[in-house]
């Protein structure tokens, strides 16, 4: 690489200069997102009581926004484990739902959970799928809209510094 014409070099310094307490931050984000969903999007107040469980998801998951599922997949798209909301899907049902054990990760319905700061999004999506399925009387949005609402309030919380100002 010829760097003679390069004037500036940037570095991604996350986890280099600072050690994050991801569990504490994600827990805070979870509560903050719940409040915004209730106050700004009209979600039922019942969701404010949803507990945060840091160990319920891991990085490397894929959210299937069309079906309300969380998938652990290989880099080749092979489904290893799947959950509908927070409930595990058995292998036979998984094969039926996905017509085998592979998914096309370029499909617009699949959203990767690929950073430590997206864990609260995945946790909350799983929980809201459970609430939607268990309480149809609440008239919650469909699965794609649930995910869209969660991502939008997360992005807004980062843009307006409302989340960081709490820290």
Question: Locations of the language-model features?
Answer:
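HAD-like aspartate-dependent phosphatase fold
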Residues: 1-167
């Amino acid at each position: 690489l010829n760097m003679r014409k390069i004037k500036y070099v940037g570095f991604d310094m996350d986890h280099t200069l600072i050690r994050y307490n991801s569990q504490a931050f994600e827990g805070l984000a979870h509560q903050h997102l719940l409040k915004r969903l209730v106050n700004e999007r009209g979600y039922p107040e019942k969701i404010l009581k949803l507990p945060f469980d840091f160990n319920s998801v891991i990085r490397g998951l894929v959210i299937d926004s069309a079906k309300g599922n969380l998938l652990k997949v290989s880099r080749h798209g092979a489904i290893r484990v799947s959950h509908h909301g927070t409930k595990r899907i058995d292998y036979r049902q998984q094969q039926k739902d996905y017509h085998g054990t592979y998914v096309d990760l370029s499909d617009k319905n699949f959203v990767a959970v690929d950073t430590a700061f997206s864990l609260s999004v995945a946790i909350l999506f799983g929980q809201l799928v459970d609430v939607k399925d268990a309480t149809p009387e609440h008239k919650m949005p469909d699965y794609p809209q649930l995910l869209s609402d969660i991502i939008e309030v997360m992005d807004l919380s980062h843009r307006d510094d409302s989340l960081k100002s709490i820290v």
